[in-house]
């Protein structure tokens, strides 16, 4: 929204607020008064937000007007800046100056030359003139990436290689090591080189670039950006919504929550230069701060026989997203030249609790069995199960169990248990039946507890609605009656299961020794 629409909306909200205040003074019903007070609070909050948006728009227009007053100076500023630095850094030294230094000190103070005083004055004036000037300075991160940040000159110093340089403080720090130390400029920092904040960085004059004002016109919903948080650092984020000069951003880090920031707390990404820059004459291809772009026909992508990221149906799918963030194009090979492997690495699930030697033996056995193509022979029957096998040894307890269960002492009848079934197998069968009874009994008890909780909730609701709504009370009474019937059925089912369980225990005690 522009300034005029915000002013119109502000006048409308003021008129509505006056009408609401008049209605409050008219003496209405208590129910209507509560709604009017709520509406009054909402209108006041809306007026405050609209006024804040109007102030933000006016501030941005004022800053744009101040920046547009000197376009000619900005074009000539980089050359003048470099010339001034070179002039202040390259001070002419006479051939015999070094040799004459010691005798002059020994003989005491002598008359100072006017040219020397002028040179010292020019050095001080040049350093003072450069201090506070904004530039675009390089920064090498800990992992070797070159980035250009907007910075401010705080003084002139000689670079490590002896060339003229300046000490700069970065204006938009993205790391804690770039954040300016609050005590450095005042000379009160006690940690000096061990300080975890930045005391400035010495940069060669040849590496400096002109200062670039952040261009917010290209930012829209879905654009990548840098957003400032309360700790003073700028984090990579993505814009999700733009409304009246306010930007809703979602940070790339999952540890940071979504935030709403103004225009002075948001920047375009640092690694993107404007498309129409005057010095982009093909030298960007050799710039180490930019990734090498592979032409569509330059790489020969291999054929992939399996679906890319097909394994992620079993995972959360973070692998393919990380590859896409690092610039990988689906169907091409890995590596900066897209000449790496195309086939994904297939996962092999090994048996749990086995060593690598045992896993290798298992794989070898499977390979041999597959190559031989011979099916495994069926397992032999247990001894005594065939017609010619010896019968298992029988004890007096087996004889008593057969007699008490009604079995014949001789050969088994048709439809009876298969031959060779011992008393231990019969005991295992009864144990599984008992386990099933216990499971059903446990499930029934859980249902009884749930029904009792539901009955208590319905009774509390009836107590709350007593004498208020007859329809609601009737419905709750019907629900209560249904829940009580269900509780009676569940209790009857529980009693039946308990009887069966006691019967099984009694049968086991009486029939097995």
From Swiss-Prot:
It is found in: Nucleus. The keyword Hydrolase does not apply. InterPro entries: G_patch_dom, Znf-CCCH_4, Znf_CCCH, Znf_CCCH_sf. Coiled coil: none annotated. GO terms for cellular component: nucleoplasm; nucleus; plasma membrane. The modification N-acetylmethionine is found at residue 1. Keywords: Acetylation, DNA-binding, Metal-binding, Nucleus, Phosphoprotein, Repressor, Transcription, Transcription regulation, Zinc, Zinc-finger. Disulfide bonds: none annotated. SMART domains: G_patch, ZnF_C3H1. Residues 115-126 have a biased composition (Acidic residues). Transcription repressor that specifically binds the 5'-GGAG[GA]A[GA]A-3' consensus sequence. Represses transcription by recruiting the chromatin multiprotein complex NuRD to target promoters. Negatively regulates expression of EGFR, a gene involved in cell proliferation, survival and migration. Its ability to repress genes of the EGFR pathway suggest it may act as a tumor suppressor. Interacts with CHD4/Mi-2; the interaction is direct. This is Zinc finger CCCH-type with G patch domain-containing protein. It comes from Ovis aries.
């Amino acid at each position: 929204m522009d300034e005029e629409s915000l002013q119109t909306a502000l006048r409308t909200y003021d008129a509505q607020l006056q009408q609401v205040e008049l209605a409050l003074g008219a003496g209405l019903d208590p129910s209507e008064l509560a709604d009017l007070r709520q509406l009054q609070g909402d209108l006041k909050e809306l007026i405050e937000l609209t006024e804040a948006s109007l102030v933000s728009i006016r501030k941005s227009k004022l800053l744009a007007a101040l920046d547009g007053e000197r376009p000619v100076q900005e074009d000539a500023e980089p050359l003048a800046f470099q010339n001034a630095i070179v002039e202040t850094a390259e001070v002419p030294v006479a051939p015999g100056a070094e040799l004459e230094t010691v005798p002059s000190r020994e003989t005491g103070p002598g008359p100072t030359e006017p040219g020397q005083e002028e040179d010292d004055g020019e050095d001080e004036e040049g350093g003072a003139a450069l201090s506070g000037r904004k530039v675009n300075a390089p920064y090498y991160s800990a992992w070797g990436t070159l980035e250009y940040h907007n910075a401010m000159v705080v003084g002139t110093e000689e670079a490590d290689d002896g060339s003229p340089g300046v000490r700069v403080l970065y204006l938009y720090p993205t790391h804690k090591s770039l954040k300016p130390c609050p005590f450095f400029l005042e000379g009160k920092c006690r940690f000096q080189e061990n300080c975890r904040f930045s005391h400035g960085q010495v940069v060669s004059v040849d590496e400096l670039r002109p200062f670039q004002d952040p261009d917010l016109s290209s930012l829209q919903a879905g654009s990548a950006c840098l957003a400032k948080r309360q700790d003073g650092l700028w984090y990579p984020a993505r814009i999700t919504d733009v409304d009246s000069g306010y930007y809703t951003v979602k940070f790339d880090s999952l540890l940071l929550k979504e935030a709403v920031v103004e225009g002075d707390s948001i920047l375009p990404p640092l690694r993107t230069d404007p498309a129409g820059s005057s010095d982009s004459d093909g030298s960007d291809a050799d710039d180490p701060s930019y990734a090498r772009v592979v032409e569509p026909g330059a790489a020969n992508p291999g054929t992939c026989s399996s679906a890319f990221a097909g394994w992620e149906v079993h995972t959360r799918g973070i692998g393919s997203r990380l590859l896409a963030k690092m610039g990988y194009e689906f169907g091409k090979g890995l590596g900066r030249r897209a000449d790496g492997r195309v086939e994904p690495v297939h996962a092999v699930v090994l048996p749990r609790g086995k060593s690598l030697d045992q896993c290798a033996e298992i794989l070898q056995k499977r390979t041999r069995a597959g190559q031989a193509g011979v099916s495994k022979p069926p397992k032999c029957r247990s001894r005594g199960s065939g017609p010619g096998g010896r019968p298992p040894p029988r004890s007096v307890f087996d004889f008593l169990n057969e007699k008490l269960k009604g079995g014949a002492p001789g050969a088994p009848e048709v439809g009876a248990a298969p031959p060779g079934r011992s008393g231990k197998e019969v005991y295992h069968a009864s144990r599984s039946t008992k386990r099933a009874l216990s499971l059903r009994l446990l499930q029934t008890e859980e249902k009884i507890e749930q029904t009792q909780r539901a009955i208590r909730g319905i009774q509390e609701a009836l107590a709350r609605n007593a004498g208020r709504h007859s329809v609601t009370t009737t419905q709750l009474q019907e629900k209560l009656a249904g829940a009580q019937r269900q509780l009676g059925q569940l209790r009857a089912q529980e009693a039946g299961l308990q009887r069966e369980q006691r019967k099984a225990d009694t049968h086991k005690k009486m029939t097995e020794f």
